[in-house]
């Protein structure tokens, strides 16, 4: 294992087969090569695409694995939008020596028929509680909740302590995390003018939400409203309208980015085959989120692990057969 290293590119021979990687040692800031019969990339969807695009040669003039022109394209991340509320019925609860539901959440899966809705696919709901450490200050102290009861905001000493006890655990939050539609016009590419501190060209990301995602976020908040109304709750934050994309987080904020080296049977329309093996270089494999053609609304990590396992089995099988 080589630590504190930054991979620049995959090196290929005259036949276009990968035989090494080039990397920068961050400690002495020198460039080295590490040879290998099989190259496995697992740098994450965007960074793996960056390595491939930087791996240009006379045979792979558009970057390694990019004869299709698809490397970097179809980048997509989960959608995300949230809303918070104050629940009067949760006031004055008995306080236990417990962690309760604070930063973690309760997961509610998608259960609706989207053929009856105005957007494709779906989303799940995450409900999280207010049993974290009480805070104090302008805009976020527990005594600010007095305004929802028509009472005076402010206080210190005994009145502040009483407010903390009364309001502790009486706020909740709901987040939606949904499936984004993979589109060719959402992509990352090499920036022709910018390099990092190691002299390696960086990525430039081009990404926008479509009406599919905006309508999904709109439905999220309509659902949140129904839940809060049924609880007798009062929304305290996070109820934007369409001019703010219904509170959609910026692309990349949910950190489920996938899709930049999509798998497929057709080398003209995909980067890898179903075993995450490059169409253009049979001894190069990708085992991160890049090969995803789409992803559902939950974290992709376990699927990445499962596909990596399958790819490992495939590599062993191909080595035994001397195919690679």
Task: State where each predicted segment sits.
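Active/binding-pocket-proximal capping segment
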Residues: 58, 193, 241-244
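Short, glycine-/Ser/Thr-/acidic-enriched flexible segments
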Residues: 6-8, 15, 24-28, 38-41, ...
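Fe(II)/2-oxoglutarate
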Residues: 165, 321-324
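FAD cofactor-binding and catalytic pocket of flavoenzymes
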Residues: 68-203, 208-214, 254-258, 279, ...
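A residue-level signal for conserved active-site and pocket-lining positions in enzyme catalytic cores
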Residues: 1, 75, 190, 224, ...
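A glycine-rich dinucleotide-binding beta-alpha-beta segment and adjacent secondary-structure elements
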Residues: 2-3, 8-13, 20, 165-180, ...
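Glycine-rich loop(s) and the adjacent beta-strand/alpha-helix scaffold that form part
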Residues: 10, 22-99, 288, 303, ...
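Short, hydrophobic/aliphatic alpha-helical segments
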Residues: 30-36, 105-112, 245-246, 286
């Amino acid at each position: 294992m080589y630590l504190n290293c930054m991979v620049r590119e995959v090196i290929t021979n005259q036949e276009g087969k990968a035989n090494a990687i080039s990397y920068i040692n961050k400690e002495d800031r020198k460039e080295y090569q590490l040879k290998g019969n099989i190259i496995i990339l697992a740098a994450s969807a965007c960074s793996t695409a960056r390595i491939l695009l930087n791996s240009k040669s006379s045979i792979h003039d558009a970057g390694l694995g990019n004869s299709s022109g698809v490397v970097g394209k179809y980048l997509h991340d989960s959608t995300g939008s949230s809303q918070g509320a104050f629940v009067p019925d949760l006031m004055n609860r008995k306080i236990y020596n417990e962690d309760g539901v604070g930063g973690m959440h309760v997961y509610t899966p998608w259960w609706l028929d989207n053929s009856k809705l105005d957007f494709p696919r779906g989303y799940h709901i995450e409900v999280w509680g207010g049993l974290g450490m009480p805070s104090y200050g302008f805009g976020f102290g527990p005594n600010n909740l007095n305004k929802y009861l028509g009472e005076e905001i402010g206080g210190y000493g005994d009145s502040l302590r009483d407010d903390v006890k009364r309001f502790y655990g009486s706020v909740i939050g709901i987040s939606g995390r949904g499936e984004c539609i993979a589109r060719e016009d959402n992509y990352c590419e090499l920036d022709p003018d910018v390099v990092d501190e190691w002299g390696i060209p960086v990525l430039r990301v081009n990404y926008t939400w479509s009406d599919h995602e905006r309508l999904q976020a709109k439905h999220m908040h309509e659902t949140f409203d129904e839940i809060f109304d049924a609880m007798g709750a009062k929304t305290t934050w996070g109820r934007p309208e369409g001019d703010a994309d219904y509170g959609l987080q910026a692309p990349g904020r949910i950190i489920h980015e996938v899709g930049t080296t999509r798998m497929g049977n057709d080398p003209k329309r995909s980067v890898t085959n179903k075993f995450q093996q490059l169409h253009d270089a049979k001894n190069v494999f990708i085992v991160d989120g890049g090969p995803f053609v789409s992803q559902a609304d939950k974290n992709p990590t376990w699927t990445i692990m499962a596909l990596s396992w399958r790819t490992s089995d495939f590599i062993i099988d191909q080595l035994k057969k001397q195919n690679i």
